[in-house]
């Protein structure tokens, strides 16, 4: 819970991979996690956002969430806009209400997130499908293979460009295996990445050389 709260507040929530929708089982164990998560988030103070315009947009998004009757606020403090340092916001909503409200699918850029309570794996899958293309999906508790974990991995890979297991998504390593992109609207180019070694592919295009002379094929792709 503390790690997740820290991820949401990292950089005042201005990471494009900041967690925004957290699916939690609607049972007693889930209740305990949500309580600990809210307490951990309540104790954090994000630093100032990058500009007054970004802070104003954050405040408008949080105000829209506050006005949504489906939401139950869990962390709901306010902060003077002049400081540019917001207070984190967290609210809880049922899976059915989340799926039915397109307005709740819109990201609030900053330290704000929704806890969606799911009663089954089927509901969790329905929530993921309603969100649409995302940069990341993180799965917790998928250490053992089962029909349910395979189904969750399947929908996660269909939803996001990067699927994490038991971690938080705010760290984006520059590495050969990195994939920072995803199906629309997460990215307009889901077949490439903007971070990692393969990012150079965004600036390349294939060219076929038909019946090329020997001197050209001997260059093995080195430009003329």
PLM feature spans:
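Conserved NAD(P)+-binding/catalytic subdomain of aldehyde/semialdehyde dehydrogenases
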Residues: 1-27, 31, 72
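C-terminal core of ALDH-fold dehydrogenases
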Residues: 81-84, 121-219
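Catalytic cores of nucleotide-enabled group-transfer and carboxylate-activating enzymes in metabolic
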Residues: 1-6, 10, 34-37, 152, ...
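NAD(P)-dependent aldehyde/semialdehyde dehydrogenase
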Residues: 24-139
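Short beta-alpha connecting loops at secondary-structure transitions
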Residues: 19, 110, 184-188
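Solvent-exposed alpha-helices and their adjacent loops that cap or buttress functional pockets
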Residues: 13-16, 106-108, 157
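Flexible, glycine/charged-enriched surface loops at secondary-structure junctions
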Residues: 12-15, 19, 46-56, 72-77, ...
């Amino acid at each position: 819970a503390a790690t997740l709260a820290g991820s949401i507040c990292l950089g005042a929530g201005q990471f494009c991979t900041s967690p925004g929708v957290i699916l939690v089982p609607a049972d007693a164990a889930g209740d305990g996690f949500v309580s600990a998560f809210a307490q951990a988030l309540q104790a954090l103070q994000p630093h100032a956002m990058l500009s007054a315009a970004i802070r104003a947009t954050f405040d408008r998004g949080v105000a829209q969430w506050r006005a949504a009757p489906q939401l139950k606020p869990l962390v709901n403090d306010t902060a003077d806009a002049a400081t540019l340092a917001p207070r984190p916001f967290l609210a809880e909503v049922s899976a059915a209400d989340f799926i039915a409200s397109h307005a709740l699918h819109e990201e609030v850029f900053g330290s704000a997130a929704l806890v969606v309570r799911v009663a089954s794996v089927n509901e969790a899958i329905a929530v993921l499908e309603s969100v649409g293309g995302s940069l990341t999906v993180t799965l917790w508790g998928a250490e053992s293979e089962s029909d349910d974990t395979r189904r969750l991995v399947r929908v996660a890979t269909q939803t996001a460009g990067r699927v994490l297991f038991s971690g938080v998504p705010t760290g984006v390593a520059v590495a050969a295996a990195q994939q920072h992109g995803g199906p629309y609207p997460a990215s307009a180019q889901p077949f490439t990445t903007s971070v990692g070694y393969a990012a150079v592919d965004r600036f390349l295009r294939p060219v076929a050389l038909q019946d090329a002379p020997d001197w050209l094929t001997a260059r093995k792709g080195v430009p003329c």
